[in-house]
């Protein structure tokens, strides 16, 4: 049994070798010749999986180690009788922590308190729900918009996108990309929406590039609209609008979900799905794969205020480490993908062990996802 895996999927070689012969291949583009005798294909979001790639090939199963699936033609796979699995929620924690790292940086730079801001969350799936929970643990007001979930009657106080635009100080997008249909998200943030944002608002896109109309956004910024922008995703990736990058406050190369934990979850989820598909079901404990964190433990004295939270968050991950490299190489062919391929190891907040002498600080840090314990001062 021959299994092709994206060369940038961590732990894929070791895990899938339990099931068959593994060949690691680049994801963009997939070497077509390798598909001629392969039984399974494991990809990331950079690989377009469709009829033109797989027609006439012996592939029986496709797995994507990503939460999003807009790069996969699921309807064609089903029609062709090819098994499929994604990894929903695998990188949700990573994306939430990316948003926090960005907001805390902007808050420090611009001198505002996050506790005084209202955050509008567009898309309340695995990422949106976790973001809502962590913001509300801090007492930060959130507004939720998710028309598909609202129409299904899912639990939640869902509001219209227009209301979020009018009321939110921060608007952050966490939707799939739907190019048409009743829940179309292509250019959901169009020129009209962008111009309607509150003066001084923050706009964040960490889902799919085309959810925000990049041309319209650049037009608004060039005209002097007072707006802070965080973009991790771009229309036309791996190409991007260099002029737009110059205008945004934080720009990164589609790495919001790139924690080691998130990548490992993606790999293990598709591994478990494929093992079940072939009748040799196996399960993997994530902590058996991950290395020991580099931070060890730290001690925190007193309550948890915003500056202290910012220091803890940026100790684990400071978004500026990914902004600067992109600006240096933007516009050079191949460099966007190279930044992603050679991405420095990044961990989640749970890797940081915090000893607190304040019980409320320990409790709050645990709610936020840190590994915190309370030890009273002596």
From Swiss-Prot:
Record keywords: Cytoplasm included?
A: yes
Gene Ontology BP terms: 'de novo' pyridoxal 5'-phosphate biosynthetic process; pyridoxine biosynthetic process
Q: Does the keyword Zinc apply?
A: no
SUPFAM superfamilies per the record? Answer: Formate/glycerate dehydrogenase catalytic domain-like (SSF52283), NAD(P)-binding Rossmann-fold domains (SSF51735)
Keyword annotations from UniProtKB, A to Z: Cytoplasm, NAD, Oxidoreductase, Pyridoxine biosynthesis
InterPro entries on file: D-isomer_2_OHA_DH_cat_dom, D-isomer_DH_CS, D-isomer_DH_CS1, D-isomer_DH_NAD-bd, Erythronate-4-P_DHase, Erythronate-4-P_DHase_dimer, NAD(P)-bd_dom_sf, PdxB_dimer_sf
| Protein origin, superkingdom | Bacteria
Q: Which pathway does the protein contribute to?
A: Cofactor biosynthesis; pyridoxine 5'-phosphate biosynthesis; pyridoxine 5'-phosphate from D-erythrose 4-phosphate: step 2/5
Binding positions for NAD(+) per the UniProt entry: 146, 175, 232, 257
Give any Pfam family that matches. Answer: 2-Hacid_dh_C
> Catalytic residues?
208, 237, 254 (proton donor)
- A cellular component term, taken from the record's GO annotations: cytosol
Main localization is cytoplasm
- Family as reported in the entry's similarity comment: Belongs to the D-isomer specific 2-hydroxyacid dehydrogenase family. PdxB subfamily.
This molecule's function is given as:
Catalyzes the oxidation of erythronate-4-phosphate to 3-hydroxy-2-oxo-4-phosphonooxybutanoate.
Q: How does it assemble?
A: Homodimer.
Kindly provide the name given to this protein in its UniProt entry: Erythronate-4-phosphate dehydrogenase
Q: Which gene encodes it?
A: pdxB
């Amino acid at each position: 049994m021959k299994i092709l895996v994206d060369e940038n999927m961590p732990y894929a070689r070791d895990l899938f070798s339990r099931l068959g012969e593994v060949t690691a291949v680049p994801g963009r583009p997939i070497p077509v010749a390798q598909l001629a005798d392969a039984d399974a294909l494991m990809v990331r979001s950079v690989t377009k999986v469709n009829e033109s790639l797989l027609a006439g090939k012996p592939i029986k199963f496709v797995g994507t180690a990503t939460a999003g699936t807009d790069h996969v033609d699921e309807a064609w796979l089903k029609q062709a009788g090819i098994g499929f699995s994604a990894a929903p929620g695998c990188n949700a924690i990573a994306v939430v922590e990316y948003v926090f790292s960005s907001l805390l940086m902007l808050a420090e730079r611009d001198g505002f308190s996050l506790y005084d801001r209202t955050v509008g969350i567009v898309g309340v799936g695995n990422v949106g729900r976790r973001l809502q929970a962590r913001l509300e643990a801090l007492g930060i007001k959130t507004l939720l918009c998710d028309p598909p979930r609202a129409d299904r009657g899912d639990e939640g106080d869902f509001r219209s996108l227009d209301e979020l635009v009018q009321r939110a100080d921060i608007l952050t997008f966490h939707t799939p990309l739907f190019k048409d249909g009743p829940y179309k998200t292509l250019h959901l943030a169009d020129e009209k929406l962008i111009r309607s944002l509150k003066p001084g608002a923050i706009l964040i896109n960490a889902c799919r590039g085309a959810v925000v109309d990049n041309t319209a956004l650049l037009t608004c910024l060039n005209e002097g609209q007072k707006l802070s922008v965080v973009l991790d995703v771009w229309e036309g990736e791996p190409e991007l609008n260099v002029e737009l990058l110059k205008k945004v406050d934080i720009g990164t190369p589609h790495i919001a979900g790139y924690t080691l934990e998130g990548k490992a979850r993606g790999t293990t989820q598709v591994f478990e799905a494929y093992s079940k598909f072939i009748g040799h079901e196996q399960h993997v404990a994530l902590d058996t794969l991950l290395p020991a964190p580099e931070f060890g433990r730290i001690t925190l004295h007193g309550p948890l205020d915003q500056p202290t939270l910012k220091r803890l968050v940026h100790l684990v991950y400071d978004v500026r480490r990914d902004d600067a490299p992109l600006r240096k190489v933007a516009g050079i062919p191949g460099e966007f993908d190279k930044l992603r391929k050679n991405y420095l190891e990044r961990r989640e907040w749970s890797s940081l062990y915090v000893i607190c002498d304040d019980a409320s600080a320990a409790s709050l840090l645990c709610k936020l996802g840190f590994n915190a314990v309370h030890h009273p001062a002596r």
